UniProtKB/Swiss-Prot annotation:
Hydrolyzes alpha and beta chains of human fibrinogen and human fibrin. No activity against the gamma chain of human fibrinogen, human thrombin, bovine serum albumin, ovalbumin and hemoglobin. Has anticoagulant activity on human plasma and protects mice against death due from experimentally induced platelet thromboembolism with an ED(50) of 40 ug/kg. This is Fibrinolytic zinc metalloproteinase. The lineage of its organism: Eukaryota, Fungi, Dikarya, Basidiomycota, Agaricomycotina. GO terms for cellular component: extracellular region. It is an enzyme of class 3 (hydrolase).
Amino acid sequence: QQRFPQRYVQLVITVDHVMN
């Protein structure tokens, strides 16, 4: 049972890449 959905995690990763 994951607290954060995988799609949310992928979105955060994408935003992190864009910010970086």
